[in-house]
Amino acid sequence: MELKRVVVTGLGAVTPLGNNPEETWKAMLEGKSGAAPITYFDTTNFKTKFACEVKGLNINDYIDRKEARKLDRYTQLALISAIQGVEDCGIDLDKVNKNRIGVVYGVGIGGIKTFEEEISYYALHKEAGPKFNPFFIPKMIADIASGHISIRFGFH
């Protein structure tokens, strides 16, 4: 197999240290930690009280509210970092062959927040029978982030 060149021309980052590459890099150079008390959910019944959460990010600065509701949080963050990367590289999407642009996005588990919400809803309403949100599977699958990035920019 012949190795091909890959060129990284733009950066995007949504991290516990910052909501863009500049903020993240600055915090890293200053030796800051992204770990802080958990605010995303009630930790009363958990031993762990600290995590590295993304803070202060307004999703709707990047993604339309209606579209954001259809996406799990991990997909929202992936899409935002991709939007930043495309903006950073300054590419003119009307002048490139989108068939030559690929999207690779790695994640260990897909939409875990969606999974937790659906299972919790089912546990509370199981007497009504199984009834899941029609976006349950599309929001959960691990490759959906790269799919939404490709859709957003028309990459093939």
Enumerate the language-model features and the residues they cover.
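Conserved "HGTGT" condensation-loop signature of ketosynthase/thiolase-family condensing enzymes
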Residues: 1-155
